[in-house]
A protein has these predicted regions:
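Exposed loop/turn and edge beta-strand positions of beta-sandwich/beta-sheet ligand-binding modules
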Residues: 63, 91, 132
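Bacterial Sec-dependent N-terminal signal peptides
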Residues: 1-26
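Mid-chain, structured segments of secreted extracytoplasmic proteins
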Residues: 66-111
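Vicinal oxygen chelate
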Residues: 40-42, 95-142, 153
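N-terminal beta-strand motif that seeds the catalytic metal site of vicinal oxygen chelate
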Residues: 21-42, 93-95, 154-155
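Core segments of cupin and vicinal oxygen chelate
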Residues: 36-76
Length: 155
C-alpha cells in the first residue's frame, strides 16, 4: 500500500514539475488597460458611459483627471484629461467593442445624432465581414475611432 501511494505521489510530482511554469512567475502578458488622452474629461466620460455603454470603475487618483471603465474581465479603458485639442486618428487604429445587435446600437447612435459609417467610409452604412460579422465605425469627441461589431463569440 505504501509503495502504491509513493508511486502515485511521485507520478503527480513529476507531472507538476514537468509544467514549465512550476515555481516560476507567469510572464505571459495579458491586456490590463488602454489609455486615451482627451480634451474634456466630463464630455468623454459621458460619451463612453452613455453612448458606448461602458461601466465606470473606481480609479485610485481621485484628482479629477481620470475616469476608468471596465471593458473586459481585468481589462480597463483609462480616459485621461489634459490633451490640448482632438487629434486626427487613422481608422486602422481603433477601439472595438462587440454588442449583441449592431442594429440596436445604431438606433442609439441615430437617436443621439452620432454619425457612423462602414469600413469604406459610406455614411450610415454597415460592413458585412466575410465571416458574417456586422461592423460600424464612429468617432468619440476627441477623434478616436470606435468599431462596434456583433462578433458572435462574445455572446
Amino acid at each position: 500500500m505504501k509503495k502504491a501511494l509513493l508511486c502515485i505521489f511521485l507520478s503527480a510530482l513529476f507531472l507538476i514539475m514537468k509544467d514549465e511554469s512550476f515555481g516560476q512567475a507567469n510572464i505571459k502578458p495579458r491586456l490590463n488597460h488602454i489609455a486615451i488622452y482627451v480634451v474634456d474629461l466630463q464630455v468623454s466620460t459621458a460619451f463612453y458611459r452613455d453612448m458606448v455603454g461602458l461601466d465606470t470603475i473606481p480609479e485610485p487618483f481621485h484628482d479629477g483627471k481620470h475616469t476608468w471603465f471596465n471593458i473586459a474581465p481585468k481589462s480597463h479603458l483609462h480616459v485621461i484629461s489634459g490633451a490640448e485639442s482632438p487629434t486626427v486618428h487613422n481608422k486602422n487604429s481603433h477601439l472595438c467593442f462587440s454588442v449583441a445587435s449592431v442594429d440596436e446600437f445604431i438606433k442609439r447612435l441615430d437617436k443621439n445624432k452620432i454619425e457612423y459609417e462602414n469600413w469604406a467610409g459610406e455614411k450610415k452604412s454597415v460592413t458585412d465581414r466575410v465571416d458574417g460579422v456586422k461592423q460600424i465605425w464612429f468617432k468619440d469627441p476627441d477623434g478616436y475611432w470606435i468599431e462596434i461589431n456583433d462578433a458572435k463569440e462574445q455572446f
